[in-house]
Amino acid sequence: MNFRDKAIILKKRNIKENLAIVTVLTQSYGIYSGIIKDLHSKKNTIIYQIGNIVDFCWSARLDKHLGTINCELVKSYSYLIMSNKRNLFYTHSLIELTLMSFKERELHANLFEKWLGNLESINVGNINIKNYINFELLILKEAGYQLTLDRCGVTNCTQNLIYVSPKSGQAISAAVGEPYKHKLLLLPKFLVHNNCEPEDIYEIQAAFNLTAYFFNKYVLIKKKLPIARELLLKSILAYSF
């Protein structure tokens, strides 16, 4: 049993002096893990870094086996990811959310394409809060919990959407939500309108609170949100506005 695909390096865990288990997100087969040998060779040290895009080859005697992998580097992003703390927190938070939200060998083609886009955003120095939250919303959607933020879940109107129902994940208009606002989640304007960016730190905090609620309730269950996510938020709030 073997296959070849384009992949992104998500995780590397050393198991012996010269062996490691590497986990990747493939374009056509979902998350896959395998053993790499000769871990500390000059070539492999360069290839198996978090965020790198690789030509991925997996082989095993049976499909259910862990298997071994061999990769060739397509494009390296590892230096850019390590170049500053925000890039590092941004990438590691999304990696951990991806690994915690999906089982291995589930196909999520949309997720792979979004990952490529985010890596390229790091490459051109264009990572931002809106991209990050939209990625979290995509992870929720791919995990089966899509939020509907473009119209009111009660009236179907598209104006004055300022709340989200914690039960349905649907936007709620100001008029409908006013009597129940203490039970509702805040909906930042920049998640409703494509041409908007966060106006202040309160909108940023509200966006992180919104996705965190649905991750905790429906996806992660007893797992904790990544520490990198908390550090990312702190770094954003410390240097924004």
Swiss-Prot record:
Key words, A-Z: DNA damage, DNA recombination, DNA repair
Biological process, per Gene Ontology: DNA recombination; double-strand break repair
Pfam families given in the database record: RecO_C, RecO_N
Xref: InterPro entries: ARFGAP/RecO (IPR037278), DNA_rep/recomb_RecO_N (IPR022572), NA-bd_OB-fold (IPR012340), RecO (IPR003717), RecO_C (IPR042242)
Coiled-coil region(s): none
Cellular component, GO, one term: bacterial nucleoid
Sequence similarity: Belongs to the RecO family.
PANTHER family tied to this protein: DNA REPAIR PROTEIN RECO (PTHR33991:SF1)
Entries under HAMAP family matching the protein: RecO (MF_00201)
Function: Involved in DNA repair and RecF pathway recombination.
Protein name from the UniProt record: DNA repair protein RecO
Annotated source species: Orientia tsutsugamushi (strain Boryong) (Rickettsia tsutsugamushi)
Name of encoding gene: recO
